[in-house]
Each structure stands twice: as structure tokens, then as C-alpha cells.
A protein has these predicted regions:
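A short beta-loop-alpha structural element at the N-terminal edge
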Residues: 3-17
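Conserved GNAT-fold acetyl-CoA-binding loop/helix
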Residues: 20-46
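A short helix-loop-beta-strand connector motif used in the catalytic cores of GNAT acetyltransferases and
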Residues: 45-57
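Conserved beta-strand in the GNAT
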Residues: 58, 64-73, 79-81, 86
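A short, internal acetyl-CoA/4′-phosphopantetheine-binding micro-motif in the GNAT/acyltransferase core
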Residues: 83-92, 118-120
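Conserved acetyl-CoA pyrophosphate-binding loop and the N-cap/start of the following alpha-helix
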Residues: 91, 95-103
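Conserved active-site alpha-helix within GNAT-family acetyltransferase domains
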Residues: 98-99, 106, 121-139
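Conserved GNAT acetyl-CoA-binding A-motif
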Residues: 107-119
Length: 157
């Protein structure tokens, strides 16, 4: 059974390890200086420990950590930015990310709008988010051969 577990400060090294493993292939393909693969330890620690309204959740099956999801919410807990969805490569394509997103929505039932951005040229990621109810809002060029697509999901409750 898949479940979410909130990460704490002591989980920093695990988060860094998962983030690097999950984004290595994307970084190698696009060589983007803002790729999560390159995010430094202190910035990740700040997001995990100090940044207000920033939440990391491990996606777990039994006691095995499959990956993590990171969101940033507004004060009212009505809007959220899905900042990082990191599923370990050996677990990708098996439904863990979709189930993690579904559980995250249950964890934050007051959030009515979910936003994110991903690499437009990475068709698999765009299709993954569309399958999970996200729709494109706009595209911004990042660099030659790489554009960021912004996506939104509205929850009617």
C-alpha cells in the first residue's frame, strides 16, 4: 500500500540522494543550470527546515521510500505549487507518482488550485501531469531547445 510520510530535518541526506538520482537523466539531457539535480544542500535544507509553508512528503510503499513530493502553499492553504516530484528511476512508470499526487490532494483538502512547471520537450512528464488532471496554461522559453510549460489543476469541492 502506498502512503505519504512527511519528511523532517533529519531526512535531508535522503532527500538530496533521491533528488539527484531522479533528476540526473534530465540534467544530462538539457544541461540546465536550474535543474533540481544541481540544487545545493543548503537550499534544499532551507526549503525543508526553514521556508514557511514548504512541505516535503516521502512516497512510500510499506517501509521503502520510492521518492518524494515537495509543495509550497499560500498562507490560506488554498493554492499550492508542486515544486518537485522525484520518484527514484527504478520506480518510475509504475504509478507511484500518480498515487502520490492523489494522496497529496487528500492531505491538503482545502487546496483548490495546484500549479507546476516542467520541461515542455520532456513529453513523458507533460503526459504524466495531464493524466493526473493538469492542463497547460502557458509556455516560457528557458534556453535553446528547452522550454518550460506551466500547468494548473483546479479542484472543485
Amino acid at each position: 500500500m502506498i502512503r505519504l510520510e512527511r519528511a523532517v530535518a533529519e531526512d535531508l541526506e535522503t532527500i538530496i540522494s533521491i533528488q539527484r538520482a531522479s533528476f540526473k537523466a534530465v540534467y544530462e539531457k538539457y544541461q540546465d543550470e536550474y535543474d533540481p539535480y544541481l540544487e545545493d544542500r543548503e537550499r534544499i535544507k532551507w526549503k525543508l527546515v526553514e521556508r514557511p509553508n514548504s512541505y516535503y512528503y516521502f512516497v512510500k510503499e510499506k517501509d521503502e521510500i520510492i521518492g518524494f513530493l515537495r509543495i509550497q502553499t499560500n498562507e490560506e492553504l488554498t493554492n499550492a505549487w508542486l515544486g518537485t516530484a522525484a520518484i527514484l528511476p527504478q520506480h518510475q512508470g509504475k504509478g507511484y507518482g500518480s498515487e502520490g499526487l492523489r494522496l497529496l490532494e487528500k492531505e491538503f483538502p482545502t487546496i483548490k488550485q495546484w500549479d507546476l512547471c516542467t520541461v515542455l520537450q520532456d513529453a513523458g512528464m507533460g503526459a504524466f501531469y495531464e493524466k493526473n488532471g493538469y492542463r497547460q496554461t502557458h509556455i516560457e522559453p528557458e534556453k535553446e531547445g528547452m522550454d518550460m510549460v506551466y500547468m494548473k489543476k483546479l479542484i472543485d469541492k
